[in-house]
Amino acid sequence: MRFLHFLIVAVLLASFMESGAMPRNPKKKRGWDTPAPCRYCQWNGPQCCVYYCSSCNYEEAREEGHYVSSHLLERQGR
């Protein structure tokens, strides 16, 4: 029974964090608070790139050698 309780709590916590209510790293600014620099793409991978780099210029990101997710490229029509 305890395992079931733990599992439910873990799933709820994971979905809460995934919804963006809690940033994965509280020290970093959330994408909807301030436009974050393109380096978030490189640090956090494709999921965070969509959130943090939505206002990011793809050409600038590519020139700086940052990773840009395919989802972001689709949004910018590339």
Curated annotation (Swiss-Prot):
Residues bearing Glutamine amide are: 76
Q: Where in the cell is it found?
A: Secreted
An annotated GO cellular component of this protein is: extracellular region
Superkingdom of the source?
A: Eukaryota
Please give the Gene Ontology molecular function terms for this protein.
ion channel regulator activity; toxin activity
* Disulfide bond residue pairs: 38-49, 41-53, 48-56
Q: Where is the signal peptide?
A: 1-21
Enumerate the UniProt keywords alphabetically. Amidation, Cleavage on pair of basic residues, Disulfide bond, Ion channel impairing toxin, Knottin, Neurotoxin, Secreted, Signal, Toxin
Propeptide part(s) removed at maturation, as residue ranges: 22-26
Tissue expression = Expressed by the venom duct.
Where would you say this protein principally sits, based on its record?
secreted
User: What does the domain comment read?
Assistant: The presence of a 'disulfide through disulfide knot' structurally defines this protein as a knottin.
| Reported function | Probable neurotoxin with unknown target. Possibly targets ion channels.
Q: What is this protein called?
A: Conotoxin Cal6.3a
Tell me what organism the protein belongs to.
Californiconus californicus (California cone)
